[in-house]
Amino acid sequence: PEHGEDWRDIMRDYDEHILRGITHWQHPMFYGFFPANTSYEGILADMLAAMTSNPGFNWIASPAVTELEFVVADWVAKMLGLSPSFHVSEPSNNGGGLIFGSASESTLTMAIAARERALHAIGEKTGEDAETVRKTWLTRLVMYCSDQAHSSGVKTARILGLQCRILPVSRQHMYALRGDTLRK
């Protein structure tokens, strides 16, 4: 837009063109996915996050955000009753976690890490250099997901150019992806 608009016009457009077609995740009768910012605390947290929104991708870019992520990761580990080896504050510094903006972002990051780890392991085993390993092995990698997995699994495989095999799970086994299913 080259010229500003009156706020009433902006809100009218928002009401007519956005709100009419939106799925209202905050509606008390919406059970399709997961709760959103429906509480006072959630709204306040969103407001504070928006006020300090900056690229928190590493400590140099945003020390406060990175340190806060470490504190929150420890809180979650403690709330889940995980051993201290999972804590960022553990002296060995082997613990920790990351906070992502979405399931898709976390799935993609996990798959990239798994892909790179697999390619490195192949290089170690075969003695091939990294470029040869990528050329030879990248198209052979397969990502496995259960038929109950989040849609971000298939999306991630497509983004990374990986084969994706969807494997069945059953209620009988509490929808767990089992070793015998993977071996087939």
Task: Show which residues each predicted segment covers.
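N-terminal entrance/gating region of PLP-dependent enzymes' catalytic architecture
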Residues: 1-94
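Hydrophobic alpha-helical scaffolding
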Residues: 4, 34, 62, 100, ...
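Secondary-structure capping and boundary motifs in well-ordered enzyme cores
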Residues: 40, 64-65, 99-106, 145, ...
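Glycine- and acidic
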Residues: 52-60, 86-98, 135-140, 163-171
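C-terminal structured subdomain/cap of oxidoreductase catalytic cores
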Residues: 66, 70, 74, 111, ...
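Conserved beta-loop-alpha segment that forms the PLP phosphate-binding cup at the N-terminus of a helix
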Residues: 69, 73, 89-137, 152-156
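PLP-dependent aminotransferase-class I/II
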Residues: 117, 121-127, 131-184
